[in-house]
Structure formats: structure tokens, C-alpha cells
């Protein structure tokens, strides 16, 4: 670690870092997540972080955290000693007008509450604004200007590019053009831009913004996993597979949401192809819940699939145990044009931490799976290509899977949030 980073925690005046993250408050209850872990390791390094998020539970039209007439409330995450601030926002469900108004609430009320927060916690020395939506970044830039400090804008989701990529918005529409203009405004006015994809700056070049947003302003800090917590959960919260899960077959595990956007139907189609080929040396176990699960279960039954099982929901703390007992973990979601910029799904890094090979059903630029040889990547996301990959894995000697496993375990170290936070610290010290 850089000497100035090592010394940072020993300064008399601890740097006060405000982490703005609309959805970070659920991390308070989950005791994990990107902003939670960054705050945890900043605190351990001698910094003085607070995390500011919405008090509205994501995608719930009723539930509020610590509902109160007050503009904000603060509760300390005792495990890490970091205050979490819950800013008043209306509840919402879905992705329509109510969610947009919830975002506006968080933006406005964060700006309104800021002076009270500064009086209570002390004026910030730097703002670390983390998006899922851009209004959080705008709030960070405005607060930095108010207090005469620097603002780091962290981009975890490209708005509107991701909406365009999923076909929910036309790229040449007036709304998209306005959002692109706002995005460019954010990148120009931020003091540093953090992107979670290794090809993040390639996106800026593709937009034609490289003349006004220099490469040195943009830093790649990947998503990752808290390995210490991951190992603790694996030990303290073991998962017992049902006795009728085959012991003599390759155990393929998918763990995650089961929604239309995840497009798990393609895995069922791949399983049908394998069944027609009389390939039965594997069992595909699908963990998770979602609104598409009932339809997929019916479809699997209608297709007569013998090698596919829906395992249901497991608590987050048991996911490490589930993954560690697999032979191969399947990373799958709908492929989009954004894949060329690299991968940043939280799930991927949990898969690496399990120390088991990864089967990616799509290809990406800057591929960790390819570069680190910790699994295989399917070049085309089709049922036939996925079936071919599974059949190939079934035919491999155990030594091949063992090598992939060892590489995954080693690779996970570089994505430990303890190490990733060192990169955040380097930015903070650069802006000090």
C-alpha cells in the first residue's frame, strides 16, 4: 500500500467523508454492500465516514425504514461503527412515476438536510456520491460547491445507456438526449469519476466526450466482496442440500433473481437440448425467487426436464455456503451492448469468492474469467452454445475444474473490498 495511504489513518484530523447512496440504507440491515464495505474499511483506516440514503425500502409501496415526520434520522451500524442517515422519501413500487418522485424526494431532502447533518456530524471534507440514478450525483456536486470541497462521483449504472440497451428507451428520444446531456454535465463537474467497469472510459470515448472528460479523471474501482465476512458467513450459516440432490453428477448452481430480465428460459432450453442428446451427467439447481419463477417452473415441467430443479429462496447469509458446495456456478443474465465495457455484477465476485469455476453464458470485454482462467465464457448467448459448454464441462477430468477453482480463489483476493477501498483512499488523498 502507498505510504501516504498507510499514514492517512494516523492523521490528527480525520477526513470526514459523506457517502451519498440512495439505496445504501438496505445495506444497513443486510450488513453488507458496496457503500457499506467502503465505509467499513474507510473507518478502519482512520477516516470518518457517514452514509446517506433514502428511508424508503426499494420497490415497496408501504415499507419505510424508521418512518418519522423528521427530514432525516441517523442510526449507527454498530458492527462497523459508521452512522447511516435515513433521508425522508416517499415509498414506491415499480419503475414508473412513483419511483421517479422517490428519487426527486431523496435529492431535494438530502440538499435540505445537509446543513443539519453538517452541524450534527461536522462539515464534510469530501463528498463521495454513488449512483444508481444520476440525481444522487447531482446532489453530491451541489453539496461540494456549497461547502467548497471536492466531489467524487461513482457511476454504478449508466443512465440512460443501460435503459437504452435494454430497449426501454430510444437513444434518439428527447428524454434520452436530456439524460445524456445531464450525464455529461456530471462527468465534467465531478472532481473524479469512479466507474465499476474496466472499460468505463471506453464508454466515454464512444459517446465522443473524451475532449472534455480526460482519461486521468476517470478511475476504475470494481465491485467486489468482503472476503472476511464471506468466509464468516460460510462458516456460521451452512446450507444443507436436500439428500435427493445427486452426489454423482456435476452440480451447476444459479443463485439470484428469477425475473424476466434475467431470461432464465434460455437455461431451460439448453437443458432440453442436453436431454435430447442424452447428456445427464449434471444437475442444474436454480436458487432464488422472482415474478418469473412460477412460469418457469411450469415450463420446466411441461418440457419434462429431469436435470433442472428450482431450490427456492435462501437467506443472503447462506449464499456463500450454497455456492461453495457447487461444482460450477452459472453467471447468467440477458446479454446487452454494455457487456463490451466489462463486468461488474456483485454476484460474479461472490462466485469467485466461493472458489468454484464460473460458467458465463455470455461474453464481455475485459473478461476476468478469460484473463484469470477461472472458468469458461460462452461466445454466443444461445441455448445451443450454453448446452455445448455444459456438455464440455461434463466431459472434463476433475483436474480441469480443480485448476479453475484454484484460479477463482486466487483471483477473488484482488476484488476483496479491503483492497478495493485502498483505491478509494488513494483518491481521497489525491484530493485532500
Per-range role (PLM):
Residues 205, 209, 219, 224-243, ...:
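Acidic anion/phosphate-binding donor-loop and adjacent secondary structure
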Residues 55, 199, 221-224:
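Carbohydrate-associated surface elements
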Residues 262, 317-322, 329-350, 359-370:
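Nucleotide-sugar-dependent
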Amino acid at each position: 500500500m502507498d505510504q501516504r495511504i498507510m499514514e492517512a489513518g494516523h492523521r490528527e484530523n480525520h477526513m470526514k467523508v459523506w457517502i451519498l447512496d440512495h439505496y445504501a440504507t438496505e445495506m444497513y440491515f443486510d450488513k453488507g454492500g458496496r457503500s457499506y464495505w467502503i465505509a467499513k474499511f474507510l473507518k478502519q483506516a482512520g477516516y470518518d465516514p457517514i452514509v446517506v440514503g433514502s428511508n424508503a425500502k426499494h420497490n415497496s409501496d408501504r415499507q419505510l425504514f424508521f418512518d418519522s415526520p423528521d427530514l432525516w434520522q441517523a442510526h449507527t451500524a454498530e458492527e462497523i461503527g459508521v452512522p447511516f442517515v435515513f433521508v425522508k422519501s416517499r415509498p414506491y413500487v415499480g419503475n414508473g412515476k412513483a419511483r421517479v418522485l422517490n428519487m426527486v424526494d431523496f435529492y431535494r431532502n438530502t440538499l435540505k438536510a445537509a446543513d443539519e447533518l453538517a452541524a450534527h456530524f461536522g462539515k464534510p471534507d469530501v463528498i463521495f456520491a454513488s449512483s444508481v440514478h444520476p440525481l444522487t450525483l447531482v446532489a453530491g456536486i451541489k453539496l461540494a460547491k456549497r461547502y467548497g470541497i471536492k466531489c467524487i462521483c461513482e457511476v454504478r449504472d449508466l443512465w440512460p445507456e443501460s435503459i437504452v440497451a435494454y430497449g426501454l428507451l430510444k437513444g434518439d428520444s428527447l428524454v434520452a438526449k436530456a439524460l445524456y446531456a445531464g450525464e455529461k454535465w456530471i462527468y465534467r463537474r465531478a472532481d473524479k469519476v469512479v466507474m465499476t467497469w474496466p472499460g468505463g472510459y471506453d464508454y466515454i470515448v464512444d459517446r465522443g466526450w473524451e475532449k472534455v472528460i480526460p482519461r486521468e479523471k476517470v478511475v476504475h474501482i470494481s465491485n467486489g466482496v468482503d472476503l472476511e465476512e464471506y468466509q464468516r458467513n460460510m462458516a456460521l450459516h451452512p446450507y444443507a442440500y436436500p439428500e435427493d440432490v445427486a452426489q454423482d453428477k456435476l452440480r451447476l448452481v444459479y443463485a439470484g433473481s428469477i425475473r424476466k430480465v434475467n431470461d432464465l428460459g434460455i437455461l431451460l432450453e439448453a437443458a432440453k437440448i442436453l436431454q435430447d442428446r442424452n447428456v445427464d451427467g449434471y444437475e442444474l439447481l436454480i436458487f432464488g425467487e422472482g415474478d418469473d419463477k412460477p412460469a418457469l417452473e411450469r415450463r420446466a415441467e411441461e418440457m419434462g426436464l429431469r436435470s433442472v430443479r428450482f431450490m427456492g429462496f435462501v437467506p443472503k447469509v447462506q449464499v456463500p455456503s450454497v455456492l461453495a458446495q457447487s461444482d460450477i456456478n452459472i453467471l447468467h443474465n440477458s446479454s446487452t451492448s454494455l457487456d463490451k465495457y466489462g463486468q461488474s455484477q456483485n454476484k460474479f465476485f461472490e462466485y469467485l469468492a466461493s472458489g468454484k469455476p464460473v460458467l458465463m453464458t455470455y461474453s464481455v470485454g475485459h473478461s476476468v474469467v478469460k484473463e484469470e482462467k477461472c472458468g469458461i465464457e460462452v461466445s454466443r448467448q444461445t441455448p445451443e452454445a450454453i448446452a455445448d459448454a455444459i456438455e464440455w464441462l461434463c466431459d472434463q477430468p476433475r483436474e480441469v475444474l480443480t485448476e479453475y477453482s484454484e484460479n477463482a480463489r486466487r483471483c477473488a483476493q484482488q476484488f476483496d473490498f479491503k483492497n478495493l477501498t485502498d483505491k478509494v483512499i488513494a483518491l481521497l488523498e489525491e484530493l485532500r
